[in-house]
Amino acid sequence: AAAASGGAQSAAMGRLVPDTLHSKALEKNLYGDTPDRPMLVYLPASYATSPGRRYPVVYLLHGFGGAERTWVTLGPVKPAMDTLVRNGTVREMIVVMPSGRNVFGGSFYTNSASTGNWDDFVSKELVAYIDGKYRTMARPESRGLAGHSMGGYGAFALGMRHAGDVFE
């Protein structure tokens, strides 16, 4: 009843945590986009109760025109993850949903002299930040990428460019 009324969440449910990362890779973009990049981080239910446990991470990249909240406003990531974990379809994991939005609506997660180094932001800074702040399994075989539209392109391109060293 508490979860349904917006009160305390059930122990069987994960939670969404807003976070922000200041990106050196995006500081010098020519259009004045902020290098402070918002994200949402889904933490599984056991994250709060199992302090010694580490988790694999999936980086979920949104499409053109979207932002970090797209996955929770247009797609039910949190309830979907809670259900998939509860049913045993997937194991518990951390899901990171960073904003790849820029002044043009989307970065395509590639490095650019004009819009900033988005590949470096995701593959170097974001991964290092998440591994440092959250209890991740900090190795390529425990990291995955997924995305929709522009994010699907980004997931494919980043996965290919950084296969074995960052993602596997």
Where are these regions (language model features)?
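Non-catalytic cap/lid and distal C-terminal segments of serine-dependent acyl enzymes
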Residues: 2-168
